[in-house]
C-alpha cells in the first residue's frame, strides 16, 4: 500500500499540525521518490519523514544565512577532520520542538516515531571523542545563536564498520551513503579548485606562485544544524572531491586504456573515501596529507569568498579587517595546514606582503590541543610535504626561520631550547614538520580541554612557549549537549528531572540540575529514579540480545566501558579485572556465590585496523565472554559482553542503561574525555583515575559519589622510572589474572605478545608503560567497594541522583559560550 492510499499528499513544508505534516510526508513519498511510490514500508517512511523535517530546517537555514549576510557579524569557522553526528531525525524534531506532532503524524500511517527513527544510519564522518565533541559543539553554537559554521570532509565509507568474528575484529566499509543522506544539500554552486604537487614559479618582480601539478575540485554538501527552540540553523559544510569531464581522457578510454583515462577521477574518489586511511606506506601518508590540505584549502577559499561577498566594497587594503570578521578554530592538529594556506592565499592570490599576511593569520587562527600522546602530535615528513605542497613548505620554512630569529633576538636565555621549539625538526635521519609547534607559533590562542590537561600543556608539553607567550594558553573544559545526551536519549529520566525541578529549562541551562540535590533523599524520587533506570536497563538488555545473542539480567549491576580501544585507556585492566573476578567465583562455594553482587561487564569500541595490541584486547574480551557466559556455575553472577560496532546510536542505548562506568586511563594521558560526562549526566556512577575531566566531575558530583583509584598524574613519570630500575613489585592478584589467561582457560589464541607488554622493565612494547600492574590492586579494591555500595539500593540511587545533579558544568553550551567570549570574540546573532 502506498503512502497516498493512507494520507492524501499535500505539500505543507512549514506546518506543525500533525494532519498537515502527514500530508507533507505523503507528498515526499509520492513526489520526491527514491523508491517505488507503490510501497510505504518503514525505510520509505524514514526517508519521506526526514525530507519533511528537512523542509522545516531549510527555512530556518536560509533565514539564518541571509541574516548573517545582512548583519555581517564576526563568524567562527570550526575546522575538524571528524564529526560524529549520530542519527539526525530524533535530534531535529526535538530541537525544533515538533516531536509530538511528528509522532502523531506517523501514527496516521501506522508507524511509531521511535521505530522510524531507528531506520536511520549513523553518518560515518568520525571515529571517537574528537568527532563527537565537534558535533556537540555545533549543536551548542546553533542553540546559542552564534554566527558559526563547521567544515569537514564527506567520507564515503567512514572509518569502518566493526564485525566480530572468531578471529576477532573485522573491518568492513561503512554503508551510510549506500542509498543517500536526506539531510545534505549538494551545492553545485560552491566549488573550489584544489592543487597538489607541482612547483613554485618566481616572477621577474620576485613574487612566488604555485603552478603545475594536478587540480581537483572541492564540491560542498551542506547539512543544516538546528538550535534548540531557536530560529537559528547553522551549517556543517562537508567537502567532496571531484574531477571534471575535461579530466577524463576520451582518447585513452576508446583505446581500451580505461584506468589511465580516468586516473584523476580515481584519485579524487580516494580523498574522501575513508577516514584516517592507513599511513604505513608512502602512498598512505600522501593520502592523509592530501585529505588535510583538501579540507583546509576548500574551507579557507570559502571563508575568503564570504568575507568579500558580505562587503562588496572590501579591497586588498582592508584585509586588516579580516580577523574582526573571521575566527578559525583548528580542532586538533589535522587542520594545521590552514596556517600556511591562509598565508599563501593572502600573499600569492590577494597580493599582501609577508608581515601583513602574518598579522592577519596570527589574529585569525586558534588551536585546540586534544592529546599529550607523542604519537598523536602529528609530524609530517619534510620530503612528503615538499613533494605534495611545495609552496606551503616554503612558507613553513620561513615561519620557522622568523621564529628562530625572534627567539634569538629577544630571549638569549632560551637559545638552548630553540631546537625543540622549532617548527622544523631537521634531524638528518628523519626531517619532519612538527604540526603542534606550528599551531603554537602561528595561532593567537592555544587551549587544552580539561583543567588537568591544560596544566600539563603549560607546565610540560608547551612550557617553553609559555615563557614567551604567557597569555596564549587557556583551558576550555569540554562539554556535551544535554539535548542529545539526556533530553532525547533518556526520555524517562528527563521527565523525572523536569517534574522535580518544575521546569524543562534545564535542557538549555544545565546548571539548574543542582536543584535535584535537595531531593536526593526523597523516597518518592528514589522510586521514580529506580524505575526509569530499570526501564533503560531493559531496553539495553534487548539491544545486547539482538546484536550478540547474549541474555543479560537487568537486575545485575551494569558495568560499561565504551570508547576507542587503546592501551592508555586500559580496557586491558578492565578485562584482567573481569578474569580475576571469574577465577574467584569459580573458587567459591555455591553458597558464597549467592552473596556476590551479580555484574554484567560490557565493553565496546573500535580498534584501529593496524593497531595490533588493541585488536588483541578486543579478541580477549570476546574470548573471556565466550567462556564466562557459558559457564553454568557462574553466569548468574558474571557476564562479559563485547558490544560490536560502537557508535552514537549504540551509545544512546548503553549510556541511559548504565550504572557503573569505567574511565580508567593512565593518569595524565586522557586530555578530557566526554563519555564520562554523558554517563554522569544519566545518573551513572564512575570508577576512574584522576585523569582528564574525571578530576572536575569528581569535584562537581562529590568525592563520595565517585570510585577513585590509581596513581596521580604527577607520580607517573617516577613510577615508570622505578619500573626501569627494577623496583616494581607486582601484586599477586595481578600475576594470578595474567597466569589464568596464559593457562589457556580462554582458548588457544596466543595472548603472549599482549601479556608481554605488561612484563619486563624496559624495551619496545614491554615494561607496562601504561601502569596496568601498578594500578591493578587499587582498581580491584575500588571494584570491591562498588560491590558493597550496590547492595545498599538506597545509597546507590542517591549516588546516581547526585551524579546527575552535579553535571551542570559539563554542558557544551557553557564550553562554547567560553570559546565565544574568550577566544573567538563573537556574539549571539539570533534570527529575528
Swiss-Prot record:
Keywords: Allosteric enzyme, Carbohydrate metabolism, Cytoplasm, Glycosyltransferase, Pyridoxal phosphate, Transferase. Coiled coil: none annotated. Its EC number is 2.4.1.1. PROSITE patterns: PHOSPHORYLASE. GO terms for biological process: glycogen catabolic process. Gene3D superfamilies: Glycogen Phosphorylase B. GO terms for cellular component: cytoplasm. It is found in: Cytoplasm. GO terms for molecular function: glycogen phosphorylase activity; pyridoxal phosphate binding. The modification N6-(pyridoxal phosphate)lysine is found at residue 678. It catalyses: [(1->4)-alpha-D-glucosyl](n) + phosphate = [(1->4)-alpha-D-glucosyl](n-1) + alpha-D-glucose 1-phosphate. SUPFAM superfamilies: UDP-Glycosyltransferase/glycogen phosphorylase. Its cofactor is pyridoxal 5'-phosphate. It comes from the Eukaryota. Phosphorylase is an important allosteric enzyme in carbohydrate metabolism. Enzymes from different sources differ in their regulatory mechanisms and in their natural substrates. However, all known phosphorylases share catalytic and structural properties. Belongs to the glycogen phosphorylase family. This is Alpha-glucan phosphorylase, H isozyme. It comes from Triticum aestivum (Wheat).
Amino acid at each position: 500500500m502506498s503512502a497516498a492510499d493512507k494520507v492524501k499528499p499535500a505539500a505543507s513544508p512549514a506546518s506543525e499540525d500533525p494532519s498537515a505534516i502527514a500530508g507533507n510526508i505523503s507528498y515526499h513519498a509520492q513526489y520526491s521518490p527514491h523508491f517505488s511510490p507503490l510501497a510505504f514500508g518503514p525505510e520509505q517512511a524514514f526517508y519521506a519523514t526526514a525530507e519533511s523535517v528537512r523542509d522545516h530546517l531549510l527555512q530556518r537555514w536560509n533565514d539564518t544565512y541571509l541574516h548573517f549576510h545582512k548583519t555581517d557579524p564576526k563568524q567562527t569557522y570550526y575546522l575538524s577532520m571528524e564529526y560524529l553526528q549520530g542519527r539526525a531525525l530524533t535530534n531535529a524534531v526535538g530541537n525544533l520542538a515538533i516531536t509530538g506532532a511528528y509522532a502523531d503524524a506517523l501514527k496516521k500511517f501506522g508507524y511509531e516515531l521511535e521505530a522510524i527513527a531507528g531506520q536511520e544510519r549513523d553518518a560515518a564522518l568520525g571515529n571517537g571523542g574528537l568527532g563527537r565533541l565537534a558535533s556537540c559543539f555545533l549543536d551548542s553554537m546553533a542553540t546559542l545563536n552564534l554566527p558559526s559554521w563547521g567544515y569537514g570532509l564527506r567520507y564515503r565509507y567512514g572509518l569502518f564498520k566493526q564485525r566480530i568474528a572468531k578471529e576477532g575484529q573485522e573491518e568492513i566499509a561503512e554503508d551510510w551513503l549506500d542509498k543517500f543522506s536526506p539531510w545534505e544539500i549538494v551545492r553545485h554552486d560552491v566549488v573550489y579548485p584544489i592543487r597538489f604537487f607541482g612547483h613554485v614559479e618566481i616572477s621577474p618582480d620576485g613574487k612566488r606562485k604555485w603552478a603545475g601539478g594536478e587540480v581537483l575540485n572541492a564540491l560542498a554538501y551542506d547539512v543544516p544544524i538546528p538550535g534548540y527552540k531557536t530560529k537559528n540553523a547553522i551549517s556543517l559544510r562537508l567537502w567532496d572531491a571531484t574531477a571534471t569531464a575535461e579530466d577524463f581522457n576520451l582518447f585513452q578510454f576508446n583505446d581500451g586504456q580505461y584506468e589511465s583515462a580516468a586516473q584523476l577521477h580515481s584519485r579524487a574518489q580516494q580523498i574522501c573515501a575513508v577516514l584516517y586511511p592507513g599511513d604505513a606506506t608512502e602512498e598512505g601518508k600522501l593520502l592523509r596529507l592530501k585529505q588535510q590540505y583538501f579540507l583546509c584549502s576548500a574551507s579557507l577559499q570559502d571563508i575568503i569568498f564570504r568575507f568579500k561577498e558580505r562587503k562588496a566594497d572590501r579591497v586588498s587594503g582592508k584585509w586588516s579587517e579580516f580577523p574582526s570578521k573571521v575566527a578559525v578554530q583548528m580542532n586538533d592538529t589535522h587542520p594545521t595546514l590552514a596556517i600556511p594556506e591562509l598565508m599563501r592565499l593572502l600573499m600569492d592570490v590577494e597580493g599582501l606582503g609577508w608581515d601583513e599576511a602574518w598579522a592577519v593569520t596570527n589574529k585569525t587562527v586558534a588551536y585546540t590541543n586534544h592529546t599529550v600522546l607523542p604519537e598523536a602530535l602529528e609530524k609530517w615528513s619534510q620530503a612528503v610535504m615538499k613533494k605534495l605542497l611545495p609552496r606551503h613548505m616554503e612558507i613553513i620554512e620561513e615561519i620557522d626561520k622568523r621564529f628562530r630569529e625572534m627567539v634569538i633576538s629577544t630571549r638569549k636565555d632560551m637559545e638552548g631550547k630553540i631546537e625543540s621549539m622549532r617548527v622544523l625538526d631537521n634531524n638528518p635521519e628523519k626531517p619532519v614538520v612538527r604540526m603542534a609547534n606550528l599551531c603554537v607559533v602561528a595561532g593567537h590562542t592555544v587551549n587544552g580541554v580539561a583543567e588537568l590537561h591544560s596544566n600539563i600543556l603549560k607546565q610540560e608539553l608547551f612550557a617553553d612557549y609559555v615563557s614567551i607567550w604567557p597569555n596564549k594558553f587557556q583551558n576550555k573544559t569540554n562539554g556535551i549537549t544535554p539535548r542529545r545526551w539526556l533530553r532525547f536519549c533518556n526520555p524517562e529520566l528527563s521527565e523525572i528531572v523536569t517534574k522535580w525541578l518544575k521546569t524543562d529549562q534545564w535542557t538549555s541551562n544545565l546548571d539548574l540540575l543542582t536543584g535535584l540535590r535537595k531531593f536526593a533523599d526523597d523516597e518518592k524520587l528514589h522510586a521514580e529514579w529506580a524505575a526509569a533506570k530499570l526501564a533503560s536497563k531493559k531496553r539495553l538488555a534487548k539491544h545486547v540480545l539482538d546484536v550478540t545473542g547474549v541474555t543479560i539480567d537487568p537486575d545485575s549491576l551494569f558495568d560499561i566501558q565504551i570508547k576507542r580501544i587503546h592501551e592508555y585507556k586500559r580496557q586491558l585492566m578492565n578485562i584482567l579485572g573481569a578474569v580475576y573476578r571469574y577465577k574467584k567465583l569459580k573458587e567459591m562455594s555455591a553458597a558464597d556465590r549467592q552473596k556476590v553482587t551479580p555484574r554484567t561487564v560490557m565493553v565496546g569500541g573500535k580498534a584501529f585496523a593496524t593497531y595490533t595490541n588493541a585488536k588483541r584486547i578486543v579478541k580477549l574480551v570476546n574470548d573471556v565472554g565466550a567462556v564466562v557466559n557459558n559457564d553454568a556455575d557462574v553466569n548468574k553472577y558474571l557476564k562479559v559482553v563485547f558490544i560490536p560496532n560502537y557508535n552514537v546510536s549504540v551509545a544512546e542505548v548503553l549510556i541511559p542503561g548504565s550504572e557503573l562506568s569505567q574511565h580508567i586511563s593512565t593518569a595524565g594521558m586522557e586530555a578530557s574525555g566526554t563519555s564520562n560526562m554523558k554517563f554522569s549526566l544519566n545518573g551513572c556512577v564512575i570508577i576512574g583515575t584522576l585523569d582528564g575531566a574525571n578530576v572536575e566531575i569528581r569535584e562537581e558530583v562529590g568525592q563520595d559519589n565517585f570510585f577513585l583509584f590509581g596513581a596521580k598524574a604527577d607520580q607517573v613519570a617516577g613510577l615508570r622510572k622505578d619500573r626501569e630500575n627494577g623496583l616494581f613489585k607486582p601484586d599477586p592478584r595481578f600475576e594470578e589474572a595474567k597466569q589464568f589467561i596464559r593457562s589457556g582457560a580462554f582458548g588457544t589464541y596466543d595472548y603472549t605478545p599482549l601479556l608481554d607488554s605488561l612484563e619486563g622493565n624496559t624495551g619496545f612494547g614491554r615494561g607496562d608503560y601504561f601502569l596496568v600492574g601498578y594500578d591493578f590492586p587499587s582498581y580491584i579494591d575500588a571494584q570491591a567497594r562498588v560491590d558493597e555500595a550496590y547492595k545498599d539500593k538506597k545509597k546507590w540511587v542517591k549516588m546516581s541522583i547526585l551524579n546527575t545533579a552535579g553535571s551542570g558544568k559539563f554542558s557544551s553550551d557553557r564550553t562554547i559560550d567560553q570559546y565565544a567570549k574568550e577566544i573567538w570574540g563573537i556574539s549571539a546573532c539570533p534570527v529575528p
